[in-house]
Each structure stands twice: as C-alpha cells, then as structure tokens.
C-alpha cells in the first residue's frame, strides 16, 4: 500500500538500493501492525545495504528516516556495533568495483540474478591490524558523516521547497521583502 502517512513505515526494497545512498523517496510503506515483532529488520542510520537480487552487489548507506525504515526481502544489511564510527573499512570494501564484480560472479538465476548472503560473506579481503583499522575507520567516519549529513540536509531543503514554492506561487505565502518590492514598483 503506497501511503505517506506518518503512521506508516518505509519498506526498503531491492530497487531502492542505489549506489551511495539509499533512495527513500520511492519506497513503499507498511503499516504499524505489519512491523510488530520485526525489530531485527529495523534499519539504522549508517547501515550499509546490498542488493541481492536484480541489482546484485549495489550498495548504499541508509540516511536518517522518520518514521523508521524496515528491510525487505532480498536486500542484505551490513552493519557494525558502533554504526558509522567503525564502518569505514567495510564501506570502502563493499563500495569497491571488485565487490560488485565478485557479487555478480557469485550470482545465479536465468531470469534474474540472485546472490546469497553466504556468497557475499566469502568476498576475499585483506584485514589490517586492529590499530590500523581503527585509525582508518576514524578517518573515514568523518567523511561518511559529512556524506550522510549533506544528503539529509538536501532532503530537508527539497521537502521545504516542495512545500513552500506552490504556496508562494499561488499567493498563499507572502514574503515581506517581496511585498515591499512590489509596493515600491507599483507606487
């Protein structure tokens, strides 16, 4: 059911997994009753999602979303205990062309490509010593925070524009500066 009521929750599907940031604009919505007992599928800001059918190997970060978003079938989630703070290495590995190529090579299916979570977990990666990994994750966390924050601010501004512009054009909303300029031009 496609409703945008605040009583409903976003359901993230395969097609919503876009490179970089998850596209929450076109998501479907599910009711509160549908998600009862499904907290393990609730997404958090900074979760890294991966397409497992169709868009095999595509990955994107989950931005803030209110009300909450929930994971749907055939979308995998990669998350860390500390969220964005220690996601850097995993993010860079999963966003690499090598990961996408690996996922596609592991996929099967004649009508639509499918890959299993176990196959994705077999992606060969070099694991650095913990101290180096922590320093790397710390540096990348700042970048990921900026990426997520910029996206979230852009979404807020887009919503504000979509709300205010029609009211401004129709005359329902008046800006004092505009009114003064119009008065100066008329008189």
Question: Where do the protein language model's features map onto the residues?
Answer:
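Short edge beta-strand segments in beta-sheet-rich domains
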Residues: 7, 70-73, 110, 118-120
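Short Ser/Thr-interspersed hydrophobic loop/turn segments at strand-loop and sheet-helix junctions
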Residues: 9-22, 42-60, 70-75, 91-104
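Extended boundary segments
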Residues: 1-13, 127
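Amphipathic alpha-helical coiled-coil/heptad-repeat segments
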Residues: 83-85, 89-93, 100-102, 106-109, ...
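His/acidic/aromatic-lined binding-pocket segments of jelly-roll/cupin-type domains
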Residues: 40-41, 50, 140, 147
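Short, well-ordered beta-strand micro-motif
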Residues: 13, 77-79, 124
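Sequence-specific dsDNA recognition surfaces
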Residues: 1-3, 15-48, 65
């Amino acid at each position: 059911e496609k409703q945008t009521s605040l009583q409903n929750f976003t359901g993230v599907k395969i097609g919503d997994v876009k490179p970089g940031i998850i596209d929450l604009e076109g998501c479907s919505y599910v009711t509160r009753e549908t998600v009862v007992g499904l907290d393990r599928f609730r997404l958090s800001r900074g979760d890294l999602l991966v397409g497992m059918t169709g868009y095999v190997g595509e990955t994107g970060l989950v931005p803030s979303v209110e009300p909450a978003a929930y994971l749907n079938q055939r979308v995998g989630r990669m998350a860390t205990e500390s969220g964005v703070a220690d996601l850097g290495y995993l993010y860079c590995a999963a966003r690499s062309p090598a990961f996408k190529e690996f996922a596609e090579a592991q996929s099967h299916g004649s009508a639509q490509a499918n890959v299993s979570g176990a196959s994705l977990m077999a992606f060969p990666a070099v694991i650095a010593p913990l101290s180096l990994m922590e320093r790397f994750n710390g540096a990348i966390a700042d970048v990921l925070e900026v990426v997520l924050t910029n996206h979230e601010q852009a979404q807020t501004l887009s919503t504000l524009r979509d709300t205010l512009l029609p009211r401004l054009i129709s005359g329902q909303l008046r800006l004092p500066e505009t009114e003064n300029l119009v008065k100066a031009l008329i008189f």
